[in-house]
């Protein structure tokens, strides 16, 4: 059997694909090694969403190809979104790769390892619970993919072309996955998809995330469910009402907005207008006081004027988001935005990213001043550090704890905040 070292690139949705492949390989009795020097096979699961992701994949493939050329590994397999996006152009670019497999190849990874063969297929038009899964996150926190693909057509985005149409898992499959996670000691589940709040649209004819959540919160051992990748259009009053009354749903919402200026939103082909976005944020905070909001913004979208940018910067200051990710616009071939006129210069994009990050830093400083002396519930990731409801794994802040003598990773504790700087807070267990 192969000795396999795995490299998983990209987002949490990609990570769940890696977990599925490793679950299959583990079931088939392959050896999964944590030290690359012990491997005879390297499996790279790639991301291709934007240029920096493709550049990272390129570096890893070339590095692994060098190891193969030196005789340090026998096989090199490349999976995921890069294969799905660029397909048959890849073998000539990376001749030492034994097999490129797209998203449909995940289920056949055992056969690919044994008998390497390229597999270029359209994106799947279905989604089901994985037969096997090997969790790669901390034992107490896991990602659960409730849907895949996307029916939105944002002008800058390649995801629909890579991942295919939006399709939801059955509720029965999701609940079964969550129960299996509970059995393995998971305390926190982050629900993920390309468009999580649209869950069930394809099955029931309307978004049905609340219906799913009502089933999930009955699972006794899971204390936190976290909603990631929400679209403002499908963040409904019913969903907010349920979050407000159900303690197992984190008062946290990851809702990428991308911009606020009306001309830019229209050019992006976003479904919500400026007024609708502002109204939705107001509604969220009315129904769920204290809700932590995370969002993403794109700086330097084609046609973004200085006036558009200043409006976005002012919006960040006004909206007071708890967490903000800022990205320079990435020109993606095949998207409407790639051929738009008035492309913004790279130098200006970089400057605008820096200004938005600075604007958000000032917001965080004001939020932090109000945190001192407050008591928050924290899920410990290790003996000295954990996360509050406001902190998603890997991408948000953390809470450093003092006075921990009897608690372990996976325990929930109450922490009194004593200081805060940036996205990191410090407190004492009480």
UniProtKB/Swiss-Prot annotation:
PROSITE patterns: MTTASE_N, MTTASE_RADICAL, RADICAL_SAM, TRAM. It catalyses: L-aspartate(89)-[ribosomal protein uS12]-hydrogen + (sulfur carrier)-SH + AH2 + 2 S-adenosyl-L-methionine = 3-methylsulfanyl-L-aspartate(89)-[ribosomal protein uS12]-hydrogen + (sulfur carrier)-H + 5'-deoxyadenosine + L-methionine + A + S-adenosyl-L-homocysteine + 2 H(+). Pfam families: Radical_SAM, TRAM_2, UPF0004. Disulfide bonds: none annotated. Its cofactor is [4Fe-4S] cluster. One of its GO terms (biological process) is tRNA modification. It comes from the Bacteria. Residues 369-430 form the TRAM domain. Its main location: cytoplasm. SMART domains: Elp3. Binds 2 [4Fe-4S] clusters. One cluster is coordinated with 3 cysteines and an exchangeable S-adenosyl-L-methionine. Keywords: 4Fe-4S, Cytoplasm, Iron, Iron-sulfur, Metal-binding, S-adenosyl-L-methionine, Transferase. [4Fe-4S] cluster 2 binds at residues 150, 154, 157. One of its GO terms (molecular function) is protein methylthiotransferase activity. [4Fe-4S] cluster 1 binds at residues 11, 47, 81. GO terms for cellular component: cytosol. It is found in: Cytoplasm. Catalyzes the methylthiolation of an aspartic acid residue of ribosomal protein uS12. This is Ribosomal protein uS12 methylthiotransferase RimO. It comes from Elusimicrobium minutum (strain Pei191).
